Structures are given as structure tokens and as C-alpha cells.
UniProtKB/Swiss-Prot annotation:
L-ornithine binds at R53, K77, R120, D235, V301. This is Ornithine cyclodeaminase. Pathway: Amino-acid biosynthesis; L-proline biosynthesis; L-proline from L-ornithine: step 1/1. Optimum temperature is 25-35 degrees Celsius in the presence of L-arginine, and 38-42 degrees Celsius in the presence of 1 mM L-arginine. The keyword Transcription does not apply. Induction: Is induced by nopaline. It comes from the Bacteria. Disulfide bonds: none annotated.
């Protein structure tokens, strides 16, 4: 059997590669295309292996692994969440991911996922709103103006036509930065001085805060009939963004209940509180929005299938392009069983001055 060529090489997508791919595609186009992959995979939800992400919690944050497989491809993401990182000039969230071939176990792709996670989170939020928000929704309150905020705004614009954004953050500089970054994209933007002001007249409310504690970003009196709430900040036990009474008034939609009950807003509720899985709405097995008066809540914590979709999308996009580089990642001896022989040959090569 002839030897297969370049088995040691895995395509690697660096941060620079990912940025170039996004801007050359157009950020809004990228979000729309990525959303298509996510929705396609949600519609075949039952074909995936699914487990809650594997988390290692510490005093200051969490490190997680998020694996899944559809039987043909296997993907996982390494991701952290450390809210205090910004004080030392670091990102709150960083990530990378791998997509592999199930038959051989060989990696097909290694990619940065800090930027890609922000894109896939925003795309998933906007997909949910497509099914759960009122069809005439054009105004969104965006509470928490950190690293995720601009991505959320652009995804909602690209997928459902939101063009008015009401911003609020406890840090006015974050709001000012977000406003500057979004001005070129055609939004009508209002910087608000409180969360209460931000939600006035909003059709959709997105919360995307980072603090790792039980907070009340939204209180019950702030939520009127017909609103869709996009709760993005939940990602670990003990971290919530809204008052429990809001949950009791809302129809709640989730990605994967076993994970959301641990990490999402619904950790405040009884373990058997009824929720609807988003994939069932997409496939017509359950109903999303039933009336213009209904309050809907997407309790988003992020799930591995979204990362799988993102890696699959990027793999397809970079194939044959300049948006990746070859990475010598896998040992590839001439004889598969002679791994030690590789070391001996390398030793001999170095002795000869190579």
C-alpha cells in the first residue's frame, strides 16, 4: 500500500487568518453564512452525540471542553471564562478548536476560536430571535457592551433587520467604544445611562454581561408584553442576569436542557420547570412565538454543536484559499509502528549538522 502524503500536516487557522476570512467575506455575510450552517446542524440535532461541557471551575473563572460528533466528524472547543482578565489586559474569553475525521481520528483543522466563538454566539442568538421575536422587531437593547456586543448587533441586523440599538454598560467607556464601532454599519444608536432607560421601547433585550455572580441586570418591572429576551451572559453555575420572576412570566427556550439547567438563567428554577428546545422549534415539532403579547426568553449558554457548525463552515471556506497555513502537528513515521525510529533518525540528522 503506497504511503499517504503529508499526513503530518493539519491546516491551521490563526487569528490573522480568521480576521482576513471574516473581512474578505464581509462580517454580515459571514454571520449569515455561518447561521446557515448552525441551523442546518440544529435541524439534525438527534444525529449528534451530546453531553454538557466539561468544566473546571476556579475562584476566578472556568476552563471548559465542549465536544460533539455526528458520527462522521468530531469537534471540540477549549474555552475559558475569566471576567477579571480585562484588568490585566487579557481577554475574558479565549478559545481554540479542532475538527477531526471520525474514521481515522486524524485532525482535519486546528483553528483559533476566540473570534469565531463571538461570531457563532451572535449568529445563534439571531437565529433564535428569527423564531421567537415578533416579526416587526427593529429595536434592541444591548446591556453589557463588552467583547460580544458588536457581534450581537450585527447578527441581529443581518438576520432579522434590527437597525436601532440602545446601549448600556456600567462602564461608559465600553458603551462609547461599542457605539463608535457600530456607527459605520447603519444603525440608529442611543447610549443610555441605565438598564431601565435602555429597555424602553425595545422589542428585543440582549444581556451580555461578564461578572461571575448572581446579578439582577433585568428586574421584573422592566419587561413588558411582547418582548423577546436574549440572555447571553449565562455560562456557569452561580452566574445569572435576571430576576426569577421574569423567568416565571416567560416562555423559555434553550439549547441543551441538561447544560442550561446547570449554567443558565433557569438554574434559579425547579429542575422540572418546563422549557422548549430550540431545535424542536426549528423543525416544527414545537411552537415558538404564539402571540404578539407573549414574552419569550432564549436562555443561551452556548453548546458544542454551534462550535461544530462553526468549524465545519470555516473548513469549507478555507479549502483552497490562503486563509490557513500548514502546521506540522502529527508524527508520521515511514512505518506507522516505528515511532521511536523517528527520534533516532532525527538524532542522526542533528549529529550530521542538520
Amino acid at each position: 500500500m503506497p504511503a499517504l502524503a503529508n499526513l503530518n500536516i493539519v491546516p491551521f487557522i490563526s487569528v490573522e487568518n480568521m480576521m482576513d476570512l471574516a473581512v474578505s467575506t464581509g462580517i454580515e455575510n459571514f454571520l449569515v453564512q455561518l447561521a446557515g450552517y448552525i441551523e442546518e446542524d440544529f435541524r439534525r440535532w438527534e444525529s449528534f452525540d451530546k453531553i454538557p461541557r466539561i468544566a473546571s471551575h476556579s475562584r476566578d473563572g472556568v476552563i471548559e471542553l465542549m465536544p460533539t460528533s455526528d458520527g462522521t466528524l468530531y469537534g471540540f472547543k477549549y474555552v475559558n471564562g475569566h471576567p477579571k482578565n480585562t484588568k490585566s489586559g487579557r481577554q475574558t474569553v479565549t478559545a481554540f478548536g479542532v475538527l477531526s475525521d471520525v474514521d481515522s481520528g486524524y485532525p482535519l483543522l486546528l483553528s483559533e476560536m476566540t473570534i469565531l466563538t463571538a461570531l457563532r454566539t451572535a449568529a445563534t442568538s439571531a437565529i433564535a430571535a428569527k423564531y421567537l421575536a415578533r416579526k416587526d422587531s427593529r429595536t434592541m437593547a444591548l446591556i453589557g457592551n463588552g467583547a460580544q456586543s458588536e457581534f450581537q448587533a450585527l447578527a441581529f441586523k443581518a438576520l432579522i433587520g434590527v437597525d436601532r440599538i440602545r446601549l448600556y454598560d456600567i462602564d461608559p467607556e465600553a458603551t462609547a467604544r461599542c457605539s463608535r464601532n457600530l456607527q459605520r454599519f447603519g444603525f440608529q444608536i442611543e447610549a443610555c445611562t441605565s438598564a431601565e432607560q435602555a429597555v424602553e421601547g425595545a422589542d428585543i433585550i440582549t444581556t451580555a454581561t461578564a461578572d461571575k455572580h448572581n446579578a439582577t441586570i433585568l428586574s421584573d418591572n422592566m419587561i413588558g408584553p411582547g418582548v423577546h429576551i436574549n440572555g447571553v451572559g449565562g455560562d456557569c453555575p452561580g452566574k445569572t442576569e435576571m430576576h426569577r420572576d421574569i423567568l416565571l412570566r416567560s416562555d423559555i427556550f434553550v439549547e441543551f436542557p441538561p447544560q442550561t439547567r446547570i449554567e443558565g438563567e433557569i438554574q434559579q428554577l425547579a429542575p422540572d420547570h418546563p422549557v422548549t428546545e430550540l431545535w424542536r422549534v426549528m423543525t416544527g415539532q414545537d411552537v415558538g412565538r404564539k402571540s404578539d403579547k407573549q414574552i419569550t426568553l432564549f436562555d443561551s449558554v452556548g453548546f458544542a454543536i454551534e462550535d461544530f457548525s462553526a468549524l465545519r463552515y470555516v473548513r469549507d471556506r478555507v479549502e483552497g484559499s490562503s486563509h490557513s497555513s500548514p502546521l506540522d502537528l502529527l508524527a508520521d513515521p515511514d512505518e506507522p509502528r516505528d515511532l521511536f525510529g523517528m527520534l533516532l533518525r532525527r538524532q542522526a540528522f542533528r549529529r550530521l549538522g542538520g
